[in-house]
Each structure stands twice: as structure tokens, then as C-alpha cells.
């Protein structure tokens, strides 16, 4: 195992199971009105209102159970959340991390391309909030020069992996949707790990990856922004290079399950390998993500719909098919979690659920 992986693991005190962090179990507090989007990833609560959970005397119990559910299912969807305000959205996602064990020093992320300097607001009045990222088809075209000549699969990612303390959970509420298009797709990092043979699993468990996001520097230079030096949601997240090293396989501390971490253009190099070897391994891991539609789920947005996902063990991508005459706009808040680590005592999702072959 890589020395950096061992160092990360030893920084956390073991608990009674022998694992670095004891996995959490739901209490059963949440209502049973839901359905699984696929057998592997995704759950939808068609009637549950997050604002009611926030205002309930059992708030912490509900939100803790929801955090565990999101970590187990990868992403959870909620329809027509018109009463969920921006302030509640930020408080909710921070509580989701805190009630499931994130460090006290981790808060809500501030995007390196400061929200207050962009030309889109969190509401029709144009108000800005540096703790809310406005997801906008218009802004995406401006900053990143989205092109129909690129593969759409280039967009697969987990949020903020270039940070030393990356994201645990994120929440997105859609404000405006086009008549058609703009769906988001999620994929399971747990299942990607489970699709590897045992020897290949052991191989990638010994690797670390250099994560970066040069697109942000390019976008900032293109439109005259400056990268915000931080701190960005955690004291460790400072500087303008936007580079961090993380294990290729990480343990989700909430479930105790192993997941592939980082995808495609997020990773510049596997540190322990020669450049050509690194390219081949990354190519194969990328194919696991893009070529297996049975470890993905797709969500068609309505106005005020909400998605909450676990960035430690899932990937997502928007579908860049919004017509230029229409707009897709939503407000996203991103909680920051812990330094990624691989627990040698952790298991795969299928092994934990008794589904391993």
C-alpha cells in the first residue's frame, strides 16, 4: 500500500469494529414513501418535503438518516421543493455532513471562481452568495466554451476533488428548466470498484492520483477572473494551484464501502506509475464509468426539484443538450468532508450487501 494511504489511515483512531471509522446505520425515521431509481444507484422520495424535515423537532434524526441513505444510494431525489430556501439549503447540506461525522473544521465550499464575480445570481433579483454555486447553461457556455465537438463523457466528475479536503455531500435545487434536455446522470463509484477483478482491485488500492482542474484557471484567464485563494470550506483548501493527491480507491466513512475516486479529466497522473502506464489505467477506469449504463441513473429535472449526492462514492455529469434559446439554472451548495483515505478493513458494496459473486 502506498505510504500516503497508510498515513491517511493512521491519522484516524480505530474504533470497535477494527475500522478507522464505524459505519453508520439508519434508524428507520424517514417515511417509507420512496422508490429505488435503479438497483444500484438512486432513490426518489416523490412527496417528502425537506423544509418539513428542517422544521421538525426530530430534525437531526431525520437528516442523519438521510445522510446515510444518500451515502448508500449515491444520490437521492426530491420533487417540487419550493419551500426550501437558499438559507435552508446551505444549512441542510452542512448538517448532512455534521450529523454523519465530518470534521468540525469542515464547512461549505467557496468556489475558486467566486460566485460574486459572475453575471448570474441565485434569484431573479441577481443576488449573489459565495457559498452557492449557480449552475447555469448560459454561464457554462461562457466560461468553458462547451462544444458539440467534444465527447459529452468529458463532463463526468465528482465535486472539488482538486481540494485537499474535498466534498462529502452536495445539494442542487433547479430554479429554471428548459422544455426538454438538461438531464443529469449519476454513476456509482462503489459499483465501478465491484466491476474490477480481485487482483486489479488490489493493484489500484495501492495507487494515489494527482487531481487538478486546469479548466478553472483557463476559464478565469479567459474572462478576467482571479482564482480565489481560500480558505475554501476547510483550512487546508488554500492556494491557487488547485492540485491535490488522493487515493484511487477510498473508503466512504459513512458506509464503510470502497469506491473508485476521481474520474477522467480530474486526474492528471497516477503517482506511482510511469506516464504511459498511468494513461492505460485511467483509460480503463474511465471506460468502467462511461461504458456501463447499468451503474448509472438519469434524472429529468422539474422546477424546484432537488438532488442530494455523495461525492465520495458517485460521479455525475450534466447533459449538454440545452438549446441556446432556453436556460437551465440551479443553486448548488457543497459541503466539505474529510481527507480521503483507504481503510484496509473496509469492504466493497456488494460484499457488504451479500451480493458478491
PLM region spans:
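Fe(II)/2-oxoglutarate oxygenase catalytic core
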Residues: 2-73, 79-308, 312-357
Amino acid at each position: 500500500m502506498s505510504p500516503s494511504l497508510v498515513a491517511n489511515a493512521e491519522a484516524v483512531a480505530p474504533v470497535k469494529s477494527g475500522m478507522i471509522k464505524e459505519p453508520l446505520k439508519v434508524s428507520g425515521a424517514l417515511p417509507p414513501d420512496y422508490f429505488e431509481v435503479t438497483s444500484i444507484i438512486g432513490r426518489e422520495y416523490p412527496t417528502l418535503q425537506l423544509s418539513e424535515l428542517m422544521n421538525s423537532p426530530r430534525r437531526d434524526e431525520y437528516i442523519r438518516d438521510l445522510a446515510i441513505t444518500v451515502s448508500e444510494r449515491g444520490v437521492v431525489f426530491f420533487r417540487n421543493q419550493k419551500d426550501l430556501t437558499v438559507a435552508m439549503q446551505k444549512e441542510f447540506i452542512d448538517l448532512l455532513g455534521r450529523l454523519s461525522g465530518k470534521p468540525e473544521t469542515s464547512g461549505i465550499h467557496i468556489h475558486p471562481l467566486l460566485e460574486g464575480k459572475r453575471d448570474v445570481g441565485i434569484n431573479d433579483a441577481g443576488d449573489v452568495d459565495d457559498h452557492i454555486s449557480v449552475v447555469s447553461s448560459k454561464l457554462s457556455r461562457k466560461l468553458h466554451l462547451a462544444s458539440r465537438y467534444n465527447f459529452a463523457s468529458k463532463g463526468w466528475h465528482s465535486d472539488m476533488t482538486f481540494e485537499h479536503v474535498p466534498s462529502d455531500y452536495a445539494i442542487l435545487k433547479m430554479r429554471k428548466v428548459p422544455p426538454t434536455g438538461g438531464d443529469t446522470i449519476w454513476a456509482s463509484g462503489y459499483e465501478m470498484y465491484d466491476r474490477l477483478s480481485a487482483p486489479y482491485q488490489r493493484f489500484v488500492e495501492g495507487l494515489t492520483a494527482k487531481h487538478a482542474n486546469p479548466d478553472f484557471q483557463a476559464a478565469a484567464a479567459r474572462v478576467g477572473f482571479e482564482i480565489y485563494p481560500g480558505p475554501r470550506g476547510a483550512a487546508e483548501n488554500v492556494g491557487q494551484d488547485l492540485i491535490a493527491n488522493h487515493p484511487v480507491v477510498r473508503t466512504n466513512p459513512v458506509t464503510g464501502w470502497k469506491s473508485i475516486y476521481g474520474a477522467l479529466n480530474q486526474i492528471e497522473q497516477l503517482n506511482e506509475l510511469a506516464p504511459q502506464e498511468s494513461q492505460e489505467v485511467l483509460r480503463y477506469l474511465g471506460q468502467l464509468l462511461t461504458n456501463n449504463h447499468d451503474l448509472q441513473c438519469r434524472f429529468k429535472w422539474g422546477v424546484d426539484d432537488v438532488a442530494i449526492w455523495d461525492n465520495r462514492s458517485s460521479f455525475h455529469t450534466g447533459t449538454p443538450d440545452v438549446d441556446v434559446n432556453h436556460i437551465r439554472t440551479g443553486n448548488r451548495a457543497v459541503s466539505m468532508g474529510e481527507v480521503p483515505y483507504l481503510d484496509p478493513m473496509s469492504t466493497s458494496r456488494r460484499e457488504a450487501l451479500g451480493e458478491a459473486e
